[in-house]
Amino acid sequence: MLAIGLLASVHVVAQAPSPARPTEVPPLPADAHVGQTIELGGRTLNYTATVGTIPVYGADDKRSGDVVFTAYTMDGADRPVTFALNGGPGASSVYLNLGAIGPKHVKFGDQGDSPSDPPTLADNPGTWLDFTDLVFIDPIGTGYSRSVESAEQTKKDFYSTDNDIHYLSRVIYDWLAKNHRLRSRKYLVGESYGGYRVPRLTHYLQAQLGVAMNGVVAVSPYLNPTINENSDFSPMPWVTTLPSMAAANLERQHKLSAETMAPVIAYARGDYAADLLRGRSDPQALTRLVDRVTELTGLDKAFVRRAGGRLEIGAFLREAHREQGALGSVYDSNVTSFDPFPFASSQQSNDPLLESIIAPTTTAMVDFVTRVVGWDVSARYHALSYEVNGQWDTDSAALRQGAVPDLREAVAADPKLRVLIVHGWNDLSCPFMGSVLTVDQMPVMGDPARVSVREYPGGHMFYSRPESQAALRKDVLALYGQH
């Protein structure tokens, strides 16, 4: 989960500097395996869970780090393999693993879930394991993956946009070669900043390492980092976020559907954008904006007028639930918590959802890795690393360019490659409208459905809702069935 820069926008308690790295870093354990079963759709699936490492080497062929993976595999000659990454940067793959598509899951991320709930793993009805093997990758600095270099060299080699793509591509290549799976059908799935990674990984693997992906699933992706810039001039920041705010209001009224969202989307990309561009040249534009935005969001009209019909995300998340003394989450504005500082002029606490998911995912994953699989490690597990996020090179030209050029080139080069982009309606961290507008500006290369966008009830982690998770599984099955 997460998109770059979001962690910097919330209140974070200062952390002590990391201790100096020892001269010799003790080795991680050898790969460990355990046989497991789940019940899925009336069938029993037997599979092997593996926790292991892939070494990373620098330009001098010296080992620079160790990437830890969790793999779930079943017997079968023709099974595809799917590589999964989360985002941040600084997030491990635990959210896709134990929240979305792995064979076991722990409940988190929905309204009413508590960090102190017992993190019990149960069979996951939304898993993809029955139709693909799964390999979850934790980038350096997340999970148990670690650098063996100095802090300065680690930042240079691992916490920059291009180098991140280069070493992760090699990790995927090395896993395929080590496990004799280069001839398998291959897929990538990435969430949030992981959704930025997977188009770029696809193109780099295809063009530089000679490994072609069959399909890509981008979950709540961060495709186009500059789309929301320059809000004083461009209408795009407001056009991309208004539909998700309206979706949250429709959901609170139990009216959210693709049908009710259609006129919202049409307004956002039509009259709303036009009136924003008109500005003071049309004295009636502001009145039209305020009336329609008030109707769509259900907010107080005076509040909308003060904002000029341009609703800043943080202000919206407080205003939407102010009467209840609650805050909405940027990841799903209808997931709330009490506002601990209700009289402050701006939000003073961390995001409600972000705060609540670290404990259950960390506890469940550490117990699974060490006790269930038997990968006996004493290191700390980082489900979410603020340190990695804070050290990331956010000023690089490659990051500002976004993932869309790589997406276009990868799709153009392989006429059989298919890409599914999926979002939750309520997500304000990576709004669905950004992907809709981005894809609509891409040229049609063969079948228009080769690159498609789907939306589901929920937010950034919409898969925490059983109905949305089931709908995602159905759409992904259809994608895999094309190959």
Show where each model-derived region lies.
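N-terminal cap/lid subdomain of alpha/beta-hydrolase-fold enzymes
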Residues: 16-21, 61-159, 440
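A catalytic-pocket lid/entrance helix-loop region that shapes and gates access to the active site
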Residues: 104-107, 206-298
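Conserved acidic catalytic loop of the alpha/beta-hydrolase fold
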Residues: 166-184
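Short alpha-helix in the alpha/beta-hydrolase fold that links the catalytic acid
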Residues: 417, 431-441
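Catalytic histidine-centered segment of alpha/beta-hydrolase-like enzymes
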Residues: 459-468
